[in-house]
Amino acid sequence: MVKVSMVVQTDATNPGTDISKIIKSTNTIYGQYHFMMENLVCVTKPTEEGLEVHTCTQHMDAVQLMTSRALKMDQNKIDVHVRRLGGAYGMKISRTSQVAVACNLVAMKLNRPCRFIQPLTTTMRAVGKRLPCSNDFEVAVNNSGVIQYINTDIYEDNGYMLSELLANFGNDVYNNCYDKSKWNYKCYNTLTDTASNTFCRSPGTLENIAMAEWVLEQISYELDLDPLEVRLANLDTKYNELKEITETLKTNANYTTRRAEVDKFNNENRWKKKGLRFALLRWTPVGGQTLDVNLSVYHGDGTVVITHSGIEMGQGINTKAVQICAYLLKIPVEKIQIKANDTIIAPNGYVTGGSITSQNVGRGVKRCCEQLLERLDPVKAQMDNPTWEELIVNAFNLNVDLQAHGFVSLAETQVYDVFGATLAEVEVDLLTGEHEVKRVDLIEDVGRSVNPEIDIGQVEGAFIMGLGYWTTERLVYGSNGEVLTDRTWHYYVSQAKEIPLDFRVYLRKKSYSTDAMFGAKASGEPPMCMSVVIPFAIREAIAAARSDSGINRTKWFNIGNIAFLYIFRVT
């Protein structure tokens, strides 16, 4: 039995009347496992103060709080330590608390160390995935494909219970970058018989942005119009940055020439076809954070130590913090070190996630540096162009406090939009069902990047994770809700032969967010949403083949995100 409850409803404010066609359809996309290098682990040992917990979590405060409640221990007797994570993608926000509580219970009861390592198969069976999602919509358009009104009902599958309000994360982007005044939007939470689903890279936003892009794609098919022109015709005038981004991408990707080449290839080949498709993006970060940052300078050699509430899990948060500190203090990065995190130096810290922690840690580091420099300025004024080491020694001798604290609160939430555009070229072998991603060109607006190499790496990683989601990763459930694809023998993530042969990432130039974040924007989740361009390109290739078989090219067919070889046989 499926239980349904409404999350939010938004009504159109300016529907149109120039209606030449009404399209009704349903699109469904499915779950995704957070395929991490490091599974759920915890090591706990009793101490004279209580418990020393070493675990792999994105949320130290949650582990400490849940352990306190479950074991009826005071929080000040539970010290949670995290050095770094071997990947997380959202699973380690809440699900690590279950593992940690079990491990901590054993350590407390037996008064001896306990190590808990959950194997991959158990994790894939017991722990929830990305929310599957269905969209029932009715859209009315004119002859140019401009939306007059759209009624869209989004159903998010939370599993057997509602443990996190993930559907709310997509409420600001359900229309993506298109004219919001035409959209009647309803979002529902549903309960089914699978494990309770959880955060997964771009939770809520991927589903809503993909569904919006799906609608625009179907409009272009059924009216036989250029898909990019349909998108631009429906673009909200508030987001004109996307026109500039799209033109830049068309130029960089040599779109006009390649469009003609793809059409020529499809006309000359019967058993291999190509698709060339666009996807646009407007992504907005959700919520804020509570973060502590501490900066200490050692008087003997002037070296600097930073601790903060953020968790390093491959996104480069520590590297960016060091860069910001070195820039503001005008010292070499070699003199700065980031220490491991724990609930002693960073109590009550918010979860690391949502692609906002690197920016907020940077804000905290900036405040620490500003405090320290303010204290050092009077000392420096009395000296003749001192070195950093000389300045610190003199300041210490004058009893200057060489430790600073920066606090970032929920009240300081920054609101901005991340824009992007992607063009993908895919070739499909109609005899085997195999496909090859020939080339991907992607532009993302990351603001003024603190570290372009890290941001490009984040863009590439997120897109490839999305590529796997749309093409190779297929979750299969038994009739009782049991996961049958619980290992790499059955569940396939993108590997060397699935990634694009030619992958070109561009960062938008002359972009800026706010001074508080050095002009930087999020980079780790938005590209995940743009990966929907891959099934669009695959569908165009299949449509070309169907056309050769006498099937009307404007006849829509769904392929969703079920593993491509499977859906190819169905199509």
What do the PLM-derived regions correspond to, one by one?
Residues K238, Q414-G420, D441-A496:
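Metal/cofactor-centered catalytic core regions of large enzymes
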Residues W271-W283, D486-F503:
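A glycine-rich dinucleotide-binding beta-alpha-beta segment and adjacent secondary-structure elements
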Residues S309-M313, I454-Q458, E525:
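Short, contiguous acidic/charged loop-to-helix segments that flank catalytic cores in large enzymes
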Residues F518-P535, R539-N558:
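C-terminal structured "cap/appendage" subdomains that terminate the fold
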